[in-house]
């Protein structure tokens, strides 16, 4: 980070006013999500916790090109924390017809579409090798023994024996995954690849049984739009701001705290209040998807919300959405999170002057919203991403070193700076 943007490692009073605001007493401990029957009995210090997750949305405009017929998908994901057992949550939540899974498998990824030798494990569903997911539903696999290391790549393979379209997927994965030639290759160490894809079809979450030590494992859920989704970050490198945060949590840790997973529920084009985008790929608004994408996350401990820019820029330029409507939406997120025992962390909206849709009226809404986020006292904590990314000489613009070129999305360095500004003592035991 530049000298003008010092890191904040703790919410000390002199610096907290610029980067971080703490409000209210600590909340009661969040209840653990009940695990499915384990391969071995979990010890009292173990807890199921999400290590990776994404936000499923609807099909892209080119859905007809994203189809599979008797093929195996090998989907690559990056674990934030480790554990001794693993289970996978698949999703047909945007589908209108049942989805049949013929076989599923998980292993440690070595490189490309290949697995580390001996790491492959078959996934079962109620003891059966396959399952059918009803339209609109998720599907959780049985747990399986697999030693997963933090910050390692996993390969989830799923054989789809029927001809299906990717009606439920996360479109902007920033990660290459693989589609096989015809047949069931779920357990094959080296997948015979027909083509690559850069999305995650029918996949929502990976959980691990984490050894928690002095405190149970918990997960941070990053809820947001394309800035959380990592737009314009380097592909196949895990350089979204939640990825950088996961690295910090592993490298720097936090005394007295159990493992902290990080799950990215950002969707490019997403809004807080309304499905403004015509494309289903932008997902349902945050208020609508909150229960599925936040509260249903295994081991949810913290909501980290950076959302609202698209509500502002998609509204009519002559009369932008009132700041009060966004504030009312934030209050709903906060109330619903706290009701379930989560701590609610809010982030200020980042600069976007230079974008074609920038107007002074829209900027005024952003400033009003940010003033409330900083000073309203409703969040348990606030991280000032606006302060971190803005150009001190032109505060309505991104700092050039953090501007990816579209004047909205950060560079890799910008995403890293965002994560560096998050005080890790936010994630103490709850």
Explain the meaning of each model-derived region.
Residues 1-16, 26-34:
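N-terminal secretory signal peptides
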